[in-house]
A protein has these predicted regions:
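Conserved AAA+ ATPase "SRH/arginine-finger" region at the nucleotide-binding site
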Residues: 58-62, 131, 136, 148-161
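Conserved P-loop NTPase "ATPase switch" module shared by AAA+ and STAND
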Residues: 86-110, 124-129
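Sensor-1/coupling segment of RecA-like P-loop NTPase cores
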Residues: 33-36, 117-141
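C-terminal alpha-helical "lid" subdomain
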Residues: 1-16, 29, 39-53, 142, ...
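Conserved NTP-binding/hydrolysis module of P-loop NTPases
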Residues: 2, 54-58, 65-84
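A short acidic, amphipathic alpha-helical/loop segment
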Residues: 45, 109-116
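Pre-Walker A (Motif I) flank of P-loop NTPase domains
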Residues: 26-32
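Short glycine-/polar-rich loops that comprise or flank the Walker A/P-loop
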Residues: 53-55, 121-123, 144-149
Length: 219
């Protein structure tokens, strides 16, 4: 399988969200929310973007507290408390990507800490959550009103699926095979696993392409 980061429409929209946050005027909050069902590539995209934009990527957990947050962020900033974190980010703004934000829904103090960091520094902060994250965050009106960019990751269309297969697979999939996959699978993880399975089958059987008929026999 080719090691390529495929820029699906979701990825392009995520890039657009980050760019919009970076370029917003100072008087507009630079807080964004990306949400969607599992398996669509949100976490992989967030990590890729954090590297691309020299940002900070953190994965939340149900044990995460405001204090833990202020200990974790400084690992990237060589700072040791809130005031120094703020000072460092003012000197050299970095986007902060908080994945699995759902774990923080019942920990408003931690969410407030992130809001305060954005208020003080203007550094973009992007929350990444599951399908109902936007509904859950609506409970925190003071925070939700600060979301200037909100993006939902959608299931893949046929064009995205074709792009994923064509760029990742080392064996050709016929159009009817791609349509067959589209009718049954819409999660990135599922698609990648399927491509890997079909590549191995093609290699073991000296095949140069995968057809719908072959897939129906195997799956």
């Amino acid at each position: 399988m080719n090691k390529i980061f495929v820029k699906t429409q979701n990825v392009k929209n995520f890039i657009g969200l980050v760019e919009n946050l970076i370029n917003k005027p100072q008087n507009i909050p630079k807080i964004g929310l990306v949400y969607g069902e599992p398996g669509l590539g949100k976490s992989q995209t967030a990590l890729w973007l954090a590297c691309k934009y020299d940002g900070i990527y953190l994965r939340a957990s149900n044990l995460m507290t405001g204090r833990w947050l202020l200990e974790e962020i400084p690992r990237f900033l060589t700072s040791d408390n809130f005031n120094i974190v703020v000072k460092k980010l003012k000197q050299s703004p970095q986007g902060i990507f908080i994945d699995e934000i759902d774990y923080l829904m019942n920990n408003y103090k931690t969410i407030e800490t992130l809001r305060d960091i954005n208020d003080e520094t203007g550094s973009p902060i992007i929350f990444i959550g599951m399908g109902l994250a936007h509904r859950k965050l609506e409970r925190y009106k003071h925070l939700y009103d600060r979301f200037s960019e909100i993006l939902k990751f959608e299931t893949f269309g046929i064009n995205d699926l074709s792009r994923i297969i064509n760029q990742l697979s080392e064996v050709r999939f016929t159009p009817d095979a791609t349509e067959y996959i589209f009718s049954k699978y819409n999660r990135f993880r599922q698609i990648v696993q399927l491509i890997n399975q079909m590549e191995n089958f093609a290699k073991d059987n000296n095949l140069t392409e995968i057809t719908k008929e072959i897939m129906e026999q195997i799956l």
